[in-house]
Amino acid sequence: MRPLLTSVGPLLPTLRQATGLSFGGAALLTALPVLMMGLMALAGGWVNRLLSERASVLLSLLAIALGALWRELAPDSVQLLLSAVLGGLGIGVIQAVMPGIIKHHFLKRMALVAGLWSAALMGGGGLGAAVTPWLNRGHDWHSALAWWALPALAALVVWLWASRGLGRLTSPAGRQAGSLFRSPRAWLLGIYFGLINGGYASLIAWLPPYYMQLGWQPQASGVLLALMTLGQVAGALALPALARGHDRRPLLWAALIMQLVGFIGLIGWPLQTPWLWALLAGVGLGGAFPLCLVLALDHLPQPAAAGRLVAFMQGIGFLLAGVAPYISGLLRDYSGGFLLDWQLHTLLVLLLMALTARFHPRSYRQSGGG
């Protein structure tokens, strides 16, 4: 799923030169999929009424594969942006459906399985960042991007076999989507999730160009982004596994502190220990993602209802996060560098640390279950 997003950054200078896109326009290649992820997460309830979870995942993987293949068939700027929309649709549906499946089938190991799911997402992103520059050495840039249809097709075949006994998740109880729009707690979860993932979206879009601006080669900058995603995998596996009880705040604060140190390092000492800043930011982002999913799932006992809350959180969150790389691109066009963006995300992490205090377990029921 994630190579559709992470494969673009290491090729951005070549891509911009070939298509004439500005930094703001190039940012849409990351922003549009994230925005579509948000829209489809909000539409998840409507999708589930039309399709089973099994069919939703199958169609999602097909959309991701076609989005990647589109980049080979029509590699101009407009078609490139449309391919990002199609791939984002696929990613959005599958990310809305999987949390409910996880809670239904793995209730007692929910935090661990959510971490494994998140780690798989992020590991795929790291693969896209590391391998794409090397694919580009033997192929045109658009062919290098199109290669990422193959993992999506492989995942489709595996899911077709593995999901044969999966039934439709239903729950007569729990809030419907309309009431979630009137829930302050659901909005708080969405904003919280969005601010965290805004940092991720900006880093996958602009970390390689930032280091290429500092003199690095595309292959080295791609490896650095892959290192960040390796940190995400480690964080997604380690932090949820450490979860005890129902208070997620200590681990969320730990994840945010690592993000804070990573962004400060990118601002102050980018060339001294770049691998350390990338790893710290990655571990913090990777750990925070599944913890946010579990935090939302904790609010409601019914899997389908909890899945709707997670879908709402992801919908609002990804719509907010999708704006982040575009704002970053505008800041780059305005300032000529990326420091303003890293400074903005540093301030946002401090805000997130303050918001985390709102998520005491006692507040789950007081908030009306979402």
What is each of the regions a protein language model found here?
Residues 40-52, 235-247, 332:
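Helix-to-loop junctions at the C-terminal end of transmembrane segments
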Residues 303-338, 345:
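A late C-terminal transmembrane helix in Major Facilitator Superfamily
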Residues 55-69, 250-265:
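Structural signature of the two symmetry-related core transmembrane helices
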Residues 83-119:
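Cytoplasmic helix-loop-helix junction between adjacent transmembrane helices
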Residues 75-79, 107-164, 206:
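Helix-loop-helix hairpin linking two adjacent transmembrane segments in secondary transporters
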Residues 39-78:
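Conserved MFS/SLC helix-loop-helix module at the cytosolic interface between two early adjacent transmembrane helices
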Residues 8-9, 184-236:
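Extracytoplasmic gate region of multi-pass secondary transporters
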Residues 20, 52, 73-78, 107, ...:
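Helix-breaking motifs and short loop linkers at transmembrane-helix boundaries and internal kinks
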